A protein has these predicted regions:
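Aromatic (Trp/Tyr) and acidic
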Residues: 1-6, 10-17, 21, 25-60, ...
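Short glycine-/Asp-/Thr-/Trp-enriched loop segments that recur within the blades
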Residues: 65-66
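Proline-enriched interdomain boundary motifs that mark the N-terminal boundary
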Residues: 216-224
């Protein structure tokens, strides 16, 4: 991008010999993003090997083909993998992962066997008990309050997601594996959503395009407006 060879040299010193990281983009492993933007075209094949390899090896065929990369924060890793796939398609003018990402996001939002949505406040299927002290308003042990109505709705927060399948997912603030929320979780959600907005705008069905709209202020809760 800069035309300065020093950056390419530095990159090759760090990632030149990098092989398949066999993991999704996350806060402590950015290899997949580095491979995606590599100045060395041969590294593109390593990116594809990792992207496609995880999809092939981690997909749950019995649960709407959800790609469950890890049982702790599965939705976080899934949306991160959506995002890198969408970036690849955008950068290289392909359509290798966009349709897959679209299906995975539908799963995240509730189109799954358990009818569970892993984005708080998104629809009637949304998780109601995220593992988040400030939004819960709980006083005392989270174990005692695990299913107590929370003081605030943490609208738009991505919870951890299923440890096994959508049908066995437990919506409990006590379960930090499945209901924890974090900044890196939402970073991948927003990144994937942005990529899918562009994908649907260009290649989506009429129904999908019609669903893309700016939410009017009248439909936004007063609590959300004050955040």
């Amino acid at each position: 991008a800069t035309g300065k060879s020093a950056y390419a040299t530095k990159y090759n010193n760090v990632y030149g010999g990098r092989t398949n990281p066999n993991w999704a983009l996350c806060w402590n492993n950015v290899a997949q993003a580095a491979l995606l933007y590599s100045p060395n075209s041969s590294k593109k094949s390593v990116f594809v090997e990792n992207q496609s390899g995880l999809i092939a090896s981690k997909t749950q065929s019995g649960d709407n083909n959800f790609c469950l990369i890890d049982s702790w924060g599965s939705a976080r890793y899934n949306t991160a993998h959506q995002m890198t796939g969408l970036l690849y398609d955008t950068i290289y003018g392909k359509n290798d992962y966009s349709s897959w990402a679209n299906g995975q996001m539908k799963y995240i939002l509730g189109n799954n066997a358990g009818s569970k949505c892993f984005v708080v406040g998104y629809n009637k299927y949304s998780s109601k008990y995220p593992h988040h002290r400030a939004s819960s308003g709980y006083q005392g042990s989270v174990t005692v309050n695990a299913y107590t109505k929370q003081a605030h709705v943490l609208v738009g927060a991505l919870v951890g997601g299923p440890a096994d399948s959508s049908t066995s997912y437990v919506d409990s603030s006590e379960d930090y594996n499945q209901n924890e929320v974090a900044l890196d979780y939402n970073a991948s959600l927003v990144g994937a959503a942005a990529g899918l907005y562009l994908y649907v705008k260009n290649s989506g069905t009429d129904e999908e395009k019609a669903a893309q709209k700016v939410v009017p202020k009248s439909e936004v809760s007063s609590e959300l407006r004050t955040i």
